[in-house]
Amino acid sequence: MAIPPEVHSGLLSAGCGPGSLLVAAQQWQELSDQYALACAELGQLLGEVQASSWQGTAATQYVAAHGPYLAWLEQTAINSAVTAAQHVAAAAAYCSALAAMPTPAELAANHAIHGVLIATNFFGINTVPIALNEADYVRMWLQAADTMAAYQAVADAATVAVPSTQPAPPIRAPGGDAADTRLDVLSSIGQLIRDILDFIANPYKYFLEFFEQFGFSPAVTVVLALVALQLYDFLWYPYYASYGLLLLPFFTPTLSALTALSALIHLLNLPPAGLLPIAAALGPGDQWGANLAVAVTPATAAVPGGSPPTSNPAPAAPSSNSVGSASAAPGISYAVPGLAPPGVSSGPKAGTKSPDTAADTLATAGAARPGLARAHRRKRSESGVGIRGYRDEFLDATATVDAATDVPAPANAAGSQGAGTLGFAGTAPTTSGAAAGMVQLSSHSTSTTVPLLPTTWTTDAEQ
C-alpha cells in the first residue's frame, strides 16, 4: 500500500511476461507423461514376470525389489503434473494482475492532466477538475496495491504447492535397507571420531565457525572464539592430569632404567682405584704427595761426560700460600714422596764462588722427614767438620732462610719438548714450565751434580 502505483505497474510491465511460465509448465507436463509411461511399462513387466515362467521365490524377490522404484515413478509423475499446473496458475495470476494493474500510460496521463489543471487554475476555476483528477489517481493507487497483493498471494501459494522431487531409490533385494542402516551408523561413528580429532587439533577454527553462524561481526566473532578457547583449555587440562595418573605406572620402568644409567655414568667418571690409596696415605695436608697422585714426573738420567743432560721440562706450578690446598695447579713433583721442597738457598745460585758439596746433596735426597734432616745437620756440627773458605748451606726441609733481595731470580727458559698431558684422561691442564733437571758444576776441589729447583718455589721472604 505504501508503494506508488508507478512502481507496481512498471514491475509488471517490464517483466518477462507469462511466456516463460507457460513453457516451463509444458515441460513439466511432458516430464509427468514420461514418468507415467515408465511406470506403466514397469508395472506391465512385473505382471508378466509373475504370470510367466518366472515364478516362485526369485520372481517374488524381483517384484519386491522393483516395488519402491515403481512407486517412485508413479509419485514423481503426479508431482510433475502438479508442478506444471502450478506454473499455469502462476502465469494466469500474472495475466490477471497485468490486466487489472493501471498501465504506465494511464498514470502518465493522470500526471499530465494534473499539471495542466494546476497551470490554468486562474481564480480557482479548476478546483473541481483538479480534485477529480486527484481522486482518480488515488483510485489507481489503491487498485495497483490490491492487484499486486492478490498476485503475490497467488504466486506464493503456487510456489508452496510445488512438491519436491525425491531421488530415485536403488533397486535392491528385500532386507538391504538394514545393511545400509548399519553402514550408515558405522559411517556416522567414523565421521564423529574424525570431527572430534579435528576439534582437538584445532579447536579455535570450530569455535570461530560456530560463532559466525550467529551473524556477529568479525571482531566480535574472534573475541568470542578466543574466550571459548580459554574456557576449553581450562576445562580440558584436568583430563590431561587424570590421563597422566593412569599412565604413570607404565612410565615407572623407564624412569628406573634412566636412573641406573646415570649411576653407571657417575662410576665411569671416578679416578683409577690405584691412586686412591696413595692419596689417602699421604693425608690432606701433603701438597706434594697429592701432586704424585695426580701426575708422575718421569725420571731423567744424567748424560755421562760432564755435559748437562737434557730433560723434558715440566710445567711450573703457580705459587700458593696454602701448602695443603687440594686444588693446586699441576707442578713438578718432588723426587722423594712425602718430603716438602727445600728452600731456595739449597740449589746453585748466581754469584757464589763454589757449589754445595755432594754430601749436602745426598743428605737432601735421603731425608724423609724434617726431623731426620735436623738430626743430620746436628750430627755434622758435632763431628767438627772444618769450615772452608766459602760458605756452606745445608739443605733443610723446614729451613727458614731469607732470600737475598738483591739477587735476581734465575731466568730459565722452557724447553722445546713438553712433558705431555698430565693426569688421568688428560684432565690436568698444562702450562709453560721452567727448566728442570740435573746440572754438573765444576769447582777447584770436587765436581758435584745437584738438582735444579723450579722457579715457582717461593722463599720465606716472599711468603
Swiss-Prot record:
Transmembrane segments: 3-23, 88-108, 112-132, 216-236, 245-265, 276-296, 323-343, 419-439
Gene3D superfamilies cross-referenced by the UniProt entry: PPE superfamily
GO annotation, cellular component aspect: plasma membrane
Region annotation Disordered: where it falls in the sequence: 303-322
Keyword Secreted: no
This protein's UniProt keywords: Cell membrane, Membrane, Transmembrane, Transmembrane helix
Family matches, as InterPro entries: PPE-PPW_C, PPE_dom, PPE_sf
Localization: Cell membrane
Membrane-topology descriptor: Multi-pass membrane protein
Comp. bias intervals (Pro residues): 306-316
S-S bridge residues: none
GO biological process: response to host immune response
Domain of life: Bacteria
Family under the similarity heading: Belongs to the mycobacterial PPE family.
Protein name: Uncharacterized PPE family protein PPE1
Provenance organism: Mycobacterium tuberculosis (strain CDC 1551 / Oshkosh)
